[in-house]
Amino acid sequence: MKLIKVAAAVLNQAPLDWTGNKERILAAIEKAREEKASVVCLPELCITGYGCEDAFHSMNTVRRAWKTLEEVTPATRGMIVSLGLPVLHQKGLFNCACLIVDGRIAGFVAKRFLAGDGIHYEPRWFKPWPADVVDELRVGGESFPIGDRCFDCGGVRIGFEICEDAWVANRPGAALASKATDIILNPSASHFAFGKLEVRKRFVLEGSRAFGTSYVYANLLGNEAGRAIYDGGALIATGGRLVAAGPRFSFQEVLVTTAVVDVEATRMSQARTASFQPRLEGGDASVVHTPFEFPAVMLALPAIQWADWETGQHVKEEEFTRAEALALFDYLRKSRSQGFVVRKASTRPCCRARSNG
C-alpha cells in the first residue's frame, strides 16, 4: 500500500480582501498540517475571491494575487498545496490553479471550460485554455510551467479539473487517466442550488471510479460577494467510493476535511480495467516532475457522518433556511451593516434586528 493523506479546504472568502483571504488560506494550510495531510486542495480563485467581476481586468488585481501567492508559498514546506488565482499570460487572462510543492511553485494549470451560463460570466474575464497545449510562464525573471499540465510529485501524479471542467461531457479527467494520474484535485466555486450536492457527488464518485483515481473536491462557502451563496461541502472519493464529506452552510470561515487514500489500490484497479489504455509515447511534455517525499501515514477507515438534516425528509426546506441564514449573516458582516429592517405587509410597526457589533 502507498497511503497518502489528502485534504479539501473550504473557505469563506471576500473579493479583493487581500489580508483576510491570505489569513484564511494560511489557517487552512495550518489546519491541514495539524491533520498531517500531505496534499491540500483549496477553492477556485481563493486568493482574489471568485466574485471580483471586472476587477479581474485590473493589473493591480493580477499583481496583488501574485504577491499573495509568493507570501503564502513558504508556509507550504513539507506539503503539496493548490491555490487559485488569475494569471496573465501572452495578453490573455487565465483562471489558474497553482500547485506548490514543498515551498516551491511547481507550475500552473489553466481552466479549460469556463462557466458562462446562469449566474456565471467567466468568458467575460478569462480565456479558455486549449487541450494538450503547454507553455512557460515568465514572471520576474523566473519561468514556470503553465497550461494543460499534470505533476509527478515523488512518483505520485496529480492533475486538475477546475470546477466547470468536471461538469462537461468531455471532461479533462479522461486525458488525465491516460497519463496515469493518481489524484485529481478539483478547486471549485460552485454556488448553491437545490439538488446540486447530488450532482457533485455523482461526478466526484464517477470521476474517481472511471479514471481510477482519488478525487478531492474543495468549494467556496458563504455569501462571497453579495449575490451568490456557496454551500461548501468538501468531498473526497477514491476508486468510486466516497471516503469523506465536509459540512455545508457552516458559519466557520475555514473548514478542512481529510481522508487517507491508497494510490496503489487505484492503480491496480485501473490495471484490471480491460478498456484502459495508458499513454505510451515515451515521455509526455505535459508532465512536470518534481521531487517530494510523502510521510508515512496510518490507514484510516472512512467514517462519513452526514448531518441529520442532510438525510431527513425536508432537505429542500433545510437547505433554503440555512442558505438564507448564512447569506444574510455574511452580508451583514461583510458590508459592515448594523442590522436589517424587516417590513411586514400590514399597518403594524416595522421590526428591526440589530447585530451585536
PLM feature spans:
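Enzyme catalytic cores with a strong preference for nitrogen-chemistry domains
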Residues: 1-357
